[in-house]
Design a protein with these regions (language model features):
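FIC/Doc superfamily catalytic core
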Residues: 1-248
Length: 248
């Protein structure tokens, strides 16, 4: 029996995987062999799961999700160096509106079947034109990865891979950070890595902005540095979400 397949090339030169449309195919498993990735992925998953198990995580999930989104949007704007004042709304903040409670379910459903449409919407909300500034083939391959990939490792790593590919390759030019952050949140809800969107990874990335920028710059040569940093951000974001849940 023949199965449809596609090729996704990872950050390192020559690292490509053929992803077949089969239930047991997990295209992101090779990334688990990178230094620190498996342990940090497990820690992030455990931290996020703890928040979701809290009573408030079950009863007041909309409150926690909304607060997470607000904090994430503000931190994302700060990462990009945008001033927050009463007279303007930075593009990064506008992009987060696609995950507002009344839009989240529709955005995630569309992302699962037509990720390019969601990426275009995020880019437009971030004051872009709705298509990548460069490397459209990479965006196409990333979209195929999103729609055809499956597996435990895929569920854990897709959010950080989506973030890394968009931000490190500057696929959407100056809007790449904002698009990457919102797309990563969408992917996390889609795969169940963070099913209700509780974590606030942006705060960690803003506090460690220099390390984040350095990891973006070296992604092609050292993908583990960025992937582990992003997993650290999700774990720290879960701890922040835990505080939100306790106060809810």
């Amino acid at each position: 029996m023949n199965f449809p397949e596609f090729m996704w090339c990872g950050p390192q030169s020559g690292y490509c995987v053929i992803v077949m449309a089969m239930p047991h195919s997990d295209p992101l498993t090779p990334l688990m062999s990178l230094s620190g990735v498996e342990d940090k992925a497990a820690s992030a998953v455990a931290a996020i799961a703890r928040v979701h198990r809290r009573p408030a995580g079950l009863r007041k999930f909309d409150v926690i999700s909304s607060e997470s989104l607000l904090r994430g949007a503000r931190a994302a704007a700060a990462i990009d160096g945008a001033p927050l004042d009463a007279h303007s709304i930075p593009p990064a903040v506008s992009a987060y509106s696609l995950l507002a409670p009344e839009k989240q379910a529709a955005t995630v459903r569309t992302f699962a079947r037509a990720p390019l449409q969601v990426l275009a919407s995020i880019d437009i909300a971030a004051s872009g034109v709705g298509h990548p500034d460069q490397n459209p083939a990479v965006v196409q391959a990333l979209a195929q990865l999103i729609t055809r990939g499956a597996g435990v490792d895929f569920d854990r790593l897709l959010p950080v891979v989506v973030h890394a590919e968009i931000a490190a390759r500057s696929l959407f030019g100056a809007r790449s950070t904002a698009v990457a952050l919102v797309a990563a949140r969408t992917a996390a809800i889609h795969t169940g890595f963070d099913p209700r969107g509780f974590a606030v990874p942006e705060t960690f990335l803003n506090r460690h902005r220099a390390d984040y920028r350095a990891a973006l710059d070296t992604y092609g040569q050292d993908p583990a540095a960025l992937i582990t940093l992003l997993l650290d951000a999700w774990e720290a974001g879960a701890r922040e979400a835990d505080g939100i849940a306790q106060a809810a």
